[in-house]
């Protein structure tokens, strides 16, 4: 476990955590009954744990609020978080670890997941910053509102709508956020537009800045009413 620091100086990350098994790059999607060989493969902590580790590597004190499995796969994730200096004292221990297999091809990823998005309730002292998705913020609205009144800066991610309804009522949590980060598909679907720039402006109408992530095409942001476009750096998938 990471050394404890005061909550007021911490980044709190809230969301489901996964053991990610990542392989690629593939020339195309897998073909049933055939074996495809790739150059790269790794196992890492994904989901909220990935965000927590990224912040820890930047030198930020991080507290992760999530569920971690007590099985072998969960122990692997727990050990990785400990090595990275992430505070897991607020994590709930459950039987099975969430697992995702991620395959990279055509400049993006295809994922298959076993597990659940269920999470423990938020609580405790207000952190300096909170990273969570809109569902997590909505489920803990009283706590998040209380934290924000005490100065917590809130980053809200959006969530894929499996039902395809894209109900804007699901985004009410953005009204207590400082910035939101939908991906391109989510942004276009919620805003009912085919323009990423217009979608970014629409999300900003909730009262927060918006950064739309566009995969290999970088990001489009609406900050203080201005549209900014930033290309993605070249990296190996």
PLM regions: where:
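Ribokinase/PfkB-type carbohydrate-kinase core domain
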Residues: 2-17, 63, 79-93, 104-229
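Short active-site-adjacent structural elements
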Residues: 21-22, 72, 219-222
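Short, mixed-charge aromatic SLiMs
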Residues: 72-79
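Glycine-rich phosphate/adenosyl-contacting loop at the front of the ribokinase-like
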Residues: 1-65, 75, 231, 236-237
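Short acidic/glycine-enriched loop/turn segments that link adjacent beta-strands
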Residues: 95-98
